Amino acid sequence: SLDIKGSEYYTIYIRDIQTKKNITKEITETSGSITFSLDDKYIFYTKLDENHRGRKIYRHEIGNFTNEDELIFEEKSEAFTVSIGLSSDEKYYFINTSDHNTSEQYYFNVDEHKPKPKLIKERQRGILYSVNSWNGKFYNHTNENAEDFKIDIADNLEKPDWKTFIAAKEEVLIGGLTFLKNWIIRGETS
């Protein structure tokens, strides 16, 4: 993606690296962030509104016309902005929507041919959360009942039974997790 005007409205170009020719017509007015499908047939991208907020998530089939792009998710609140990313274990896409102090997240399986994002937990004013998956478990980095955050763990997202994985600590900001093959790295600031 490229922002040639300095406006932070990015244009996405998909180019064949061998022929150096664009495969797809340019996709304009995006956040610039691109998430590829695991089979490299699709990209997911965020369209920006006139207030420069991510509002809609689209799926584009590489090589097809952009007017055929499929709307996957639309954020209705003008106060919130939306983005999409792949889970650490590459089994789910997570759609994140948030303002400065409230968030909400949706997910769908990478194998879904017609993605239908499912809500993880409804937004509650002042509650931030971010779920990721790794090794058959789901990890929730949240400030719910934890001013400086904590990390909970669950076996599924259909009916999650969240258990404490890393408890909140007084005057210690619990950062997120990074997942490696044999390690989980966490960040803390005191």
Q: What is each of the regions a protein language model found here?
A:
Residues S1-S190:
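Peripheral, non-catalytic segments that deliver or gate enzyme domains
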